[in-house]
Amino acid sequence: MNVSRFDLKTMKKDAMNHIFDLETHPIDDLSNPAADKLVTRCQQELEAVGCAVIGSLVKPESIARMQAEAERKVDAAYWACDSHNPYMTKDDPLLPHGHPKRFFEKRESGYINSDVLDEGSDLNAIYDSQILLDFISACFGVAPIYCWADPLGSHPYSVMADGHYFPWHFDGNDFTVSILIQSADEGGLFEYAPNIRSTENENFQAVNAILHGGREGVRTLRLRPGDMQLFKGRFSMHRVTRVKGKTRRIIALPTYVVDPYTVNRPERSKQLYGRALPIHYEREKHRSDGLTD
């Protein structure tokens, strides 16, 4: 991919000690022995189970600011109540009824899209941060990586209220960073099947088994507000269990890719974010892998 033919996001090297606990997790200095140890742990966990967590990386005061922003913006969220398969594609009647591409579950959730965040948002600062980008690149062992060009889905808040459920699915991007902003009263647990597919093998049989209730290889993750999760969502199928109670589950989703030209396909963008923009149609056919989305 020749990245010189379009503009890349301009990153900022601002100090991030107003957002990150850099005393405990000195991710701003990757030569620091503590940072090196943290990167090594994350690399090992990502290799083994496709997921790593840095506990309490984001300071409580930053979490409070993002929580307040999400609550202010909740009326601008796109709320979906529809059905989708794990690939966010339309039904294909040419496939047999038992194929996972024909397995649809009802999803209820909302997204506060990236393009409606406040200019001074902590989440914008996180996504603009060269410090975080370098740390994430080191953890995933991939360089260079880039911020996602998708103007709606690059770093939204996901919001789930009482009764909401986000079914099994794969991500359309390479790497997702999740920061829990607010836990639900009950439920809202993250479940995933690590590395269940690869660019060489969609592994439809194993995917189908989990869709129909199988638990082999499924892991459950309990995040706390301020925790940062690194996740290979392109290859690990995942879901969020049903939320219960008055307190919304809110999570920030900064998203990164190896190919900066990619964006969501129009169908996925409409399902998740309520609309598709010209960029989604212009780049629809561009994919760096041959996977079903």
Q: What does each model-identified segment do?
A:
Residues V58-K59, R65-A77, H97-D150:
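Signature of the catalytic double-stranded beta-helix
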Residues L189-N195, T199-D293:
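Catalytic core of Fe(II)/2-oxoglutarate
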Residues M1-A48, A276-D293:
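Fe(II)/2-oxoglutarate
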Residues T89, P93-H97, F175:
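Long, compositionally biased
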Residues A68, R72-K90, A193:
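Short, solvent-exposed beta-strand-terminating loops
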Residues L117-N124, L133-M228:
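Catalytic core of non-heme Fe(II) oxygenases with the double-stranded beta-helix
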Residues A52-V58:
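Short amphipathic
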Residues Q43, I63-A64:
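Short functional linear motifs
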